[in-house]
A protein has these predicted regions:
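C-terminal subdomain of the subtilisin-like protease fold in secreted/lumenal serine endopeptidases
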Residues: 123, 240, 267-274, 303, ...
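Extracellular ectodomain surface segments
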Residues: 29-66, 70, 554-556
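Substrate-binding/access-modulating region of protease and related hydrolase catalytic domains
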Residues: 163-165, 210, 222-226, 240-345, ...
Length: 670
């Protein structure tokens, strides 16, 4: 009996072991614990954006911990490694959310708890509408949607971290609102300049919109700040020079804005989104040539980059509509990229404009001096706000910053440009109606800023080479304009469409070498080491030995030859300096240049609108027309310059040349 009681006592004690006051059991039942996480993600919007972190917890018992996603985000998707806690969070495209929450479960196999991961999403609310950056057919506020795929392909360059950081871009324009909420952080106020009052604030003084502010927004609107859209080179440094302000456009100011002043002498890229008001084929102006030539000395001798808009006179040239009647009827350009002497020479990169469907913008000038084309859009109106509009009026424009203050505007034309009724532009500080080659130029300037960040050693000619090599053949099936309507059934080609030259480059007077591709250009710039040797040039003169009357109403034409034997082999540019004694009107004339390889470039097509207040221009004096169509071809050999007169004999005087009308051909190359 005694032994039985002892055994019972042991049994009772065993049953009592591990009760509520036992510390060992309390420790075993505690779950893993750790701090919540607060993370931040810059949302690219044009490509997947991802962050990586680690959920760090500990278990009181030192037991293994298992991780899992209990509740995923609504803007993005999280994954986690089940044993290490390595967390990845991805937003696939744009999101309107500024915050997302993910719950991570942690378990030791006995108990579990949650860790809250809060992600602040830094976005730009208008970026899905900015088709020029990334075009998936999303609304740009116009009635017509963009056609998916027609964009500058910036995504790859941005994903690699190229943002324009460290590159200085001058906006040579009407002004620049330096306090704009989406520009201020990128503006170098100390190196900006106001030509009207000598201050460093080029913000416009008079009421109204500001062209330069919109241009600056395309280049360098600030990213990831929850405001507006995004610039192509969203970390570039912007400077404003209000050369185009009323009363500021002197030759001295022009030079100072382009590198001749201390505040502009260290600029990398000059953006010139302007055109001449002249409707004539002008003589070259040596003073402008000298200013452009000075830019060659900048960037430590590598040359600053001059980006110039190609002009907006395809169907309207000056204030006399009649000068464009024939050009419009035959579908050729009334104006030309050659109508502004400030675009002269081999330095400027002249850019045309492309619409959101990948074809030439309705207004964009054609010309042999174009280098590439970039998005310029159309007019951005919406019939919900402006009934009765159609065609290019309701096709997408470019979305960018605009001068703040609704008192500067008077019309509602779409849901963004709605006098402050849009929460996205309550102060009218953003627009969806910016267009023109004025928009194409800053788009290209932004891409070049990305290229220079990728490779600061690029010279200006290296930049041009890379752009030509990487441009896309947009509107690839375009065949040009050939008609039998001019010469009583005889076929005449006024525009050749796409032509492949003897060096393998495709070229078009509508698009230059094609549409700029940011990712391809930056990829090429990164690995570029075969820098072009010094540029050389050769020139030759030719003239008719006696008075030459060009055959009228004929494809026979009159021809001059130039025998070129330069020390260099490959052509970069060809420039003709032209003189013509008399013409019934330059609209009758076509001028073509043919290389030794047989490539033809139309320097000036017939039916152009060259005139003076509606009166046809009837002579040419020392005018320079540049062609890029021969890029990479062999320079040596016989070049031919051909002049035509397609007007009937009943129209005015004959096209004629005197022996003193000297024609010059200048080739540059390496």
């Amino acid at each position: 009996m005694k032994y039985i009681c002892v055994a019972l006592l042991v049994l009772v004690l065993s049953a009592c072991k591990g009760g509520d006051n036992d510390p060992q059991l309390t420790i075993q039942e505690l779950p893993p614990t750790g701090p919540n996480l607060d993370l931040t993600l810059n949302v690219l919007g044009v490509a997947p954006s991802m962050l990586s972190s680690n959920v760090s917890v500990s278990d009181p018992q030192g037991l293994p911990i298992a991780y899992s996603i209990v509740q995923n985000g609504t803007a993005g998707t999280a994954t986690i490694h089940p044993s290490s806690g390595a967390l990845t969070y991805t937003v696939s495209a744009h999101t309107d959310q500024s915050r997302d929450v993910v719950l991570v479960g942690v378990s030791n196999g006995k108990q579990s708890s949650n860790v809250t991961v809060t992600i602040t999403l830094k976005i730009d609310p208008l970026i899905p509408n900015q088709w020029h950056l990334h075009n998936v057919g999303y609304s740009a506020f116009a009635s017509t949607l963009p056609v998916s795929g027609n964009d500058m392909n910036v995504a790859g360059a941005w994903r690699e971290g190229f943002t324009g950081k460290g590159i200085k871009v001058a906006v040579v324009d009407s002004g620049l609102q330096i306090g704009h909420e989406d520009l201020a952080a990128n503006v170098d106020v100390a190196k900006s300049f106001n030509f009207l009052n000598g201050s460093n604030d080029p913000s416009p003084a008079a009421a109204g919109s500001d062209h330069g502010t919109a241009v600056a927004g395309i280049i360098g609107s600030v990213a990831f700040n929850g405001k507006g859209g995004r610039g192509v080179a969203y970390e570039a440094t912007l400077r404003g020079y209000n050369l185009l302000a009323n009363g500021a456009s002197s030759l001295t100011n022009f030079g100072n804005a382009l590198g001749l002043a201390p505040y502009s002498s260290d600029v990398d890229i000059f953006n010139e989104s302007f055109d001449s008001s002249s409707t004539q084929l002008p003589p070259q102006v040596n003073s402008y040539n000298a200013i452009n030539a000075n830019a060659l000395t900048l960037r430590g001798g590598k040359g600053a980059i001059l980006v110039q808009s190609g002009g907006n006179s395809f169907s309207s040239f000056g204030n006399v509509a009649a000068v464009c009647t024939q050009a419009k009827a035959f579908g050729v350009s009334c104006g030309s990229t050659s109508s502004d002497t400030r675009r002269d020479g081999t330095l400027p990169i002249v850019v045309g404009a492309i619409a959101a469907d990948g074809t030439k913008s309705s207004y964009s000038n054609a010309g042999s001096s174009l280098w590439v084309a970039a998005p310029g859009g159309e007019f951005g109106r919406n019939t919900s706000f402006v009934p009765g509009q159609s065609g290019s009026s309701i096709e997408p424009a470019i979305i960018t910053a605009s001068r703040s203050g609704c008192n500067n505007y008077s019309n509602r034309v779409n849901a963004l440009d709605s006098l402050g009724s849009s929460p996205l532009a309550a102060q009218c500080q953003y627009t969806a109606t910016m267009n023109g080659t004025s928009s194409a130029a800053p788009n290209l300037s932004g891409v070049i800023a990305l290229m220079l960040q990728a490779n600061p050693n690029l010279g200006y000619r290296d930049v041009k080479y890379i752009l030509a090599k990487t441009a896309k053949k947009t509107d690839p099936t375009r065949t040009g304009v050939t008609t039998t309507g001019l010469l009583n059934g005889t076929s005449v080609t006024l525009d050749q469409g796409w032509v492949r030259n003897a060096a393998g480059y495709w070229f078009s007077n509508w698009y230059g070498f094609g549409a700029v591709d940011a990712t391809e250009a930056v990829s090429a710039a990164k690995i570029y080491i075969n820098f072009l040797p010094a540029m050389e040039s050769v020139s030759s003169n030719s003239n008719f030995s006696s008075i030459e009357n060009v055959p009228q109403y004929s494809t026979a034409g009159s021809t001059l030859t130039f025998n070129m034997n330069p020390a260099f082999t490959k052509v970069e540019h060809a420039m003709a300096i032209l003189n013509m004694n008399d013409s019934p009107g330059l609209a009758c004339n076509q001028i073509e240049l043919i290389s030794p390889s047989g490539t033809k470039s139309i320097l000036m097509h017939a039916l152009n609108g060259y005139s003076n207040n509606g009166v046809p221009q009837q002579s040419i004096t020392n005018s320079r027309i540049l062609s890029n169509a021969f890029y990479g071809e062999t320079a040596a050999g016989t070049w031919r310059l051909k002049f035509y007169d397609f007007c009937p004999t009943t129209v005015g005087s004959r096209t004629s040349f005197l022996p003193t009308d000297i024609q010059s051909l200048i080739l540059t190359g390496h």
